[in-house]
């Protein structure tokens, strides 16, 4: 319990669904494979994810997904496509704390599926307050494979990757909110220094790898 997974974000639902599978596959002794999904009959149930309340109320599927461990929170900076400024709802923070006490929580600290957007300070405050083990995750390929919701396949044959890193070393008492935000930014590879032009040779190698991918 009290484990917080922090990740970059590429789709609304495919990212989280993949993490549920990977976590349960790993707990079942599998390495780099989610084949033979027998573990779904006895999954780890105390896995939660933080999601925007507005997103989880939009449509039937979103409402169904909300029952699969969503901790819904109100965005403080955006609502219905418009920029807003509002205070953090203390109940949202409390609900995340309750989820951490019960199990594992997944959060996307940028609060958006757009790449290289700023890390929201709310995640750093949660870390300072509840002192969880913080495990960074870096995902790739989901944005190219799926639509924004992560439901409809946009392009087949794209390799999706998920790198689960070592826990972050955090001094909960002495590190500032800004220090923690900076650590998160680098850990999930969303700092501006990670923006780079991929050489043509690398792109070709990735395409060849996708062709060899086993489903």
Where do the PLM segments sit?
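Catalytic core of membrane glycerolipid acyltransferases/transacylases, capturing the structured
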Residues: 3-84
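Short catalytic/ligand-binding loop motif for oxyanion handling, primarily in non-cytosolic enzymes
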Residues: 12-16, 57-60, 115-117, 143-147, ...
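Short, highly charged C-terminal tails/helix-capping segments
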Residues: 199-215
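A cross-family acyltransferase "interaction/gating" segment
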Residues: 101-104, 111-179
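Internal catalytic-core helix/loop-beta-alpha segment
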Residues: 71-115
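Short His-Asn-centered micro-motif
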Residues: 6-9, 50-53, 108-110, 116, ...
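Short, well-structured alpha-helical segments that form the helix of a local strand-helix-strand
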Residues: 180-188
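Generic beta-sheet signal
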Residues: 2-7, 47, 101-109, 132
């Amino acid at each position: 319990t009290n484990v917080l997974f922090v990740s970059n974000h590429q789709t609304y639902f495919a990212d989280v669904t993949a993490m549920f599978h990977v976590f349960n596959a790993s707990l079942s002794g599998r390495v780099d494979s989610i084949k033979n999904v027998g573990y779904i009959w006895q999954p780890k149930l105390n896995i939660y994810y933080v999601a925007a309340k507005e997103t989880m109320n939009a449509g039937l599927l979103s409402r169904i997904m909300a029952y699969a461990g969503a901790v819904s929170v109100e965005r403080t900076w955006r609502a219905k496509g418009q920029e807003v400024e509002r205070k953090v709802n203390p109940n949202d923070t409390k609900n995340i704390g309750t989820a951490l006490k019960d199990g594992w929580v997944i959060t996307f600290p940028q609060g958006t599926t757009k790449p290289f957007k700023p890390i929201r300070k709310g995640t750093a405050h949660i870390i300072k307050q509840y002192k969880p083990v913080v495990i960074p995750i870096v995902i790739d390929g989901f944005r190219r494979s799926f639509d924004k919701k992560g439901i409809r396949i946009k392009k087949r044959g794209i390799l999706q990757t998920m790198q689960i890193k070592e826990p972050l070393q955090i001094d909960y008492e002495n590190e500032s909110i800004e220090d923690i935000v900076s650590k998160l930014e680098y850990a999930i590879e969303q700092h501006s220094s990670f923006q780079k032009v991929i050489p043509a040779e690398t792109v070709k190698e990735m395409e060849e790898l996708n062709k060899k991918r086993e489903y």
